[in-house]
Amino acid sequence: MKKIIFIALLCAQLGHAQDSPSGLAGKHNEVRVDLLSLVALSKYNLSYERYLGEDWSLGLSVNYANNKRVNDDFDEGNRNTIPKYEITPFVRYKLSKSLSRFYFAEVFASANGGDFREITRFNENNVGYYDIEKSDYFDVAIGAGAGYKMYIKEQFAIELLVGFGVNTIDTDKSPDVFSRVGLSFGYRF
């Protein structure tokens, strides 16, 4: 009887040991920093992605920008909008068979906002004059993108992403087109 119990426990232990996959298949979480946006636009971008299986993943990207050069252009009238923040949930589908190098397609929604300026004509006592009004905007964009991702040593990620969306709510103040472009470096665990 003791031998049967011992063999049953041994088989159960061996069966349990084979349930946890190794390598990339066993790592379901990833964090990334977009260095292209940081260097080119002084925009901070941090992303988290959760792999649901071999082909699908969900993620959230958070951006914040407060660049002195862009703010000066805005104050001098060279641009009408400044995107300040973006919160972007996304869903991705892997288009390639490989786990370590693959193309992907994504759909996303983005809550984004920033500053808006416009020249407005006022009329007081039959005297017209123009003044600059500054206000905030908030909008929601929907869009799609595509990219390429590769892993080094099954944990360090390099990702290239290009995507575009359309703002849908406050189209008078917000930019018409919303872009997601980046070169990100991350860690999968």
How would you describe each model-predicted region?
Residues 24-26, 37-41, 78-84, 133-141, ...:
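Transmembrane beta-barrel outer-membrane domains
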Residues 15-18, 31, 105, 183:
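A broad, low-specificity signal marking well-ordered, structured residues that form hydrophobic/aromatic
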